[in-house]
Regions:
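Glycine-rich beta->alpha junctions and the first turn(s) of the following alpha-helix
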Residues: 2-6, 10-11, 77, 183, ...
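C-terminal helix-coil-helix/basic helical segment that borders enzyme active sites and/or dimer interfaces
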Residues: 24-32, 263-273, 280-315, 326-334, ...
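Internal helix-loop-helix
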Residues: 46-115, 156-163, 297, 345-346, ...
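A short, Trp-centered hydrophobic/proline-enriched beta-strand micro-motif
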Residues: 115-123, 167, 495-507
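A short core secondary-structure module
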Residues: 145, 149-195, 522, 526-566
């Protein structure tokens, strides 16, 4: 995601100012007239954007990919077409930078950086789109050069540009075919190149997109990229990796614009529509995934899988955001006097460009299978984590695979409380996960616990839920309790001598709401709309209840007069978690049994604790989704249909790609919220986003895993039916509560900056 480091580069502020003061005002006139924005392009040249990724030694800005993506996002927030001029040019420059000879770099890169060379890509042909290997354009050697013949389609900058990276066949007999492909830098100014026509389009107007015809066009051998034939396909693919990140950044910018327009439409409305929350979650998820891939690219890591996921998710999110904005705005949303209808027309391009999303899904699935076998290693990699955090997570992962996951099968069948697994976690010190070390705890930060909670959730949703209840109670006492309460309770909770739990209200009309009234020197509580987790196995519970329009945190102990565990709460999923319906029958509590005692906690402190609890639930949901995905990945390789493993069937590949991408987004949303640890104005909204998306992802992935397994997925002999049942607990909780969506919608409608995006 964008970090202060990315925004700190002066070019980001300069581009934002350029967009706000010049681009936004002029975009509609250029777009409706479909005229090339010469003045805006000239300004981008003045800003140095044509040399964005060209190193300073060649006259460029030398930006990293993440900062460049930030620049592209800003431009697309104002006018997506304008970014096309830069992106196509930059891809051509990157091909030379990454693959050219030293002489080619010295000769061409300064011209690309200055904008004297206006670049583009000549890849697509009338009969070869996403399948680049199907090209027919040929380059025949003649003397000291080549003669190029063929037709290229959808060339951005085709009319206004002058220097193109072109892929052609130099050996049509090569097997496999890509080994006969070479990449050339072709420059206008010679006979044999004709701009056949500019292509009329649904959107992406104002920038020229042309068909070019090459008829024995001469190209000097010095312009063969790298100086060696047969390497062109690799050269082009290396450029497309960055190109997909750029497409993702463009999509994020357009989605951000749609969010802002939808938020403006909801401004002043007493209760913003919940649909605004969906847009905000999509925008944030797309942004996080895009900058995750960009960061990997900058670190020199292989990121073709991650770049493809970013392109897929961001482009789909932009399309959905634009459509939702039109739904929200109604008639004004489709008016040509506004910009939402332009966004609606622009977004399909990003689902098609740099490889259609359907082809992208098949590539993602094949990549997952080839690179990671039966484990989604790249998406659970801990290499970038601090050593101590990594070692703890690895220890938990080993315990999960060796003991917790196998035990979960029998515990679920018997409906048995997972005491043995919990004792194993207690031995690792995880009962004191968030408790300070001087009180016997581990003092794990938010991201560390999220990693661990995901691993536990991957092994057993019930174990993850019970541990979460305990940690939630400890965290509330830590954040809200008095010094005496912390000293008395936290060491015992850390060691496991006391087990904590929470009381949460049910969304159940037949149950009475909790009523807490001031009474003498304390409070009296009545009501029966509560679930206690983990029921009979907890010693102390924490309840948040409203008193005089503010929340108070109450401590209730098992055996407290008026506090009754009424009956077991049997559920489809998370069997054995020992949930109980409870009743408060005039339960009288002195002030000493409120967290903080006489000093009531602030609303911000309570909101922070609630946010962190939602993050812990999100992390466990990601783990559940991960388990279901791994099961599907294994089964798809083991099961055959029509003579081949079902993972080779496109329908299965599309599902695997969507499942993996959704999990990656859920994990990134969760880790972002975990890093905030409930602190900051945006933390509650970010935690809610993570919670909602992770819960929906767990449901989607468990269901899709069942589809892939077929009848076996419905059978109790396979774990998938348990995963699907466990997902129901997530939907029945806060994730199904519209109040949580409305809180996100209010955050978006208020114009809060979402992860670096413009307000």
């Amino acid at each position: 995601m964008p970090t202060p480091l990315h925004d700190a580069h002066p070019i980001v502020a300069a581009v934002r100012q350029f967009v706000d003061k010049e681009v936004v005002l002029a975009a509609s006139s250029f777009e409706h007239a479909d005229t090339y924005p010469h003045d805006l392009v000239a300004r981008m040249r003045e800003l140095g954007l044509f040399g964005s990724l060209v190193p300073a030694e060649y006259g460029g800005l030398g930006l990293d990919v993440a900062t460049y993506a930030r620049v592209i996002e800003e431009i697309c927030r104002g006018f997506m077409s304008l970014a096309g001029v830069i992106n196509s040019h930059t891809m051509a420059a990157l091909i030379v930078l990454q693959n050219g000879t030293d002489e080619q770099k010295r000769r061409l890169l300064p011209r690309f950086a200055s904008g004297a060379a206006r670049g583009g890509l000549c890849l697509t042909e009338p009969h070869a789109g996403s399948d680049v290997q199907a090209i027919r354009t040929v380059a025949k050697r003649q003397g000291d050069g080549y003669l190029i013949s063929g037709s290229k389609m959808f060339v951005t900058n085709g009319r206004e540009g002058n220097t193109f990276a072109l892929l052609a066949l130099t050996d049509a007999s090569a097997k496999p075919r890509y080994r006969g492909m070479s990449c050339f830098i072709v420059e206008k100014g010679h006979a044999g190149l004709q701009v056949v026509k500019s292509i009329a389009k649904l959107g992406y107007k104002g920038v020229d997109t042309a068909e070019l015809l090459f008829d024995s066009f001469p190209c000097p051998a010095d312009n063969l990229v790298g100086g060696v034939e047969g390497r062109g396909f690799k050269h082009v693919m290396s450029g497309l990796e960055a190109g997909r990140i750029n497409i993702a950044a463009r999509a994020v910018g357009v989605a951000q614009a749609a969010l802002e327009e939808a938020a403006r439409g909801a401004h002043g409305v007493a209760e913003p529509p919940a649909a605004l929350a969906s847009i905000a979650i999509r925008v944030d998820g797309a942004r996080l995934l895009t900058y995750w891939a960009a960061g990997m690219k900058d670190r020199g890591e292989r990121c073709d899988l991650e770049a493809g996921m970013a392109k897929l998710h961001a482009s789909e999110s932009a399309q959905e955001a634009a459509a939702d904005a039109i739904r929200m705005l109604g008639g004004p949303g489709q008016a040509t006097s506004g910009i939402v209808e332009r966004l609606y027309r622009d977004t399909p391009l990003m689902m098609i460009g740099e490889g259609t999303n359907e082809i992208q899904r098949t590539i993602i699935a094949k990549n997952l299978l080839q690179r990671h076998g039966e484990r989604l290693g790249a998406l659970t990699s801990l290499e970038a984590e601090p050593e101590e955090r990594r070692q703890m997570a690895l220890a938990v992962r080993q315990l999960v695979e060796r003991e917790i996951a196998p035990a979960a099968v029998e515990d679920d069948r018997a409906g048995r409380f997972p005491s043995v697994s919990l004792d194993k976690l207690k031995a690792l010190g995880l009962f004191g996960a968030v408790i300070p070390q001087d009180m016997g705890g581990l003092n794990l930060d938010g991201p560390a616990y999220a990693l661990i909670a995901e691993e536990i959730g991957r092994g057993s949703a019930s174990v993850a839920a019970v541990l979460k209840d305990h940690v939630d109670a400890a965290d509330l006492i830590l954040r809200l309790g008095s010094a005496e309460q912390r000293q008395r309770l936290l060491p015992a909770l850390a060691s496991g001598k006391l087990r904590g739990g929470t009381l949460r209200r049910l969304r159940e009309p037949a149950r009475r709401e909790i009523n807490a009234l001031s009474h003498a020197d304390g409070f009296i509580l009545t009501g029966d709309g509560l679930i206690a987790g983990p029921g009979r196995h907890a010693d102390v519970f924490v309840l948040l209840a409203p008193v005089d329009e503010r929340l108070i945190a109450f401590l209730l102990e098992v055996g407290q007069p008026g506090f009754v565990l009424a009956e077991p709460f049997e559920t489809a999923g998370r069997r054995g978690a020992d949930l109980w319906h409870t009743q408060l029958r005039g339960c009288v509590l002195p002030s000493s049994q409120t967290l903080g005692g006489e000093v009531a906690p602030t609303s911000a402190a309570i909101a922070g604790a609630q946010a962190s609890a939602r993050v812990r639930e999100a992390a466990a949901a990601v783990g559940l989704a991960q388990a279901a995905f791994e099961a599907a990945l294994r089964y798809s390789q083991q099961r055959s249909a029509f003579g081949v493993p079902i993972c080779q069937h496109q329908a299965i590949q599309l599902k695997l790609a969507d499942m993996a991408t959704a999990i990656a987004v859920a994990r990134l949303l969760t880790q972002r919220a975990a890093a905030e640890d409930g602190a900051g104005d945006a933390a509650p909204a970010h935690a809610a986003m993570a919670h909602l998306h992770a819960a929906e992802t767990a449901y989607m992935v468990t269901l899709e895993s069942m589809r892939i397994h077929g009848g076996y997925g419905y059978s109790a002999e396979f774990p998938v039916e348990r995963y699907y049942r466990d997902a129901s607990a997530l939907l029945a909780g806060e994730a199904g509560d519209e109040a949580l969506r409305r809180s996100i919608a209010r955050h978006a409608a208020a114009g809060a900056t979402l992860d670096g995006g413009p307000a």
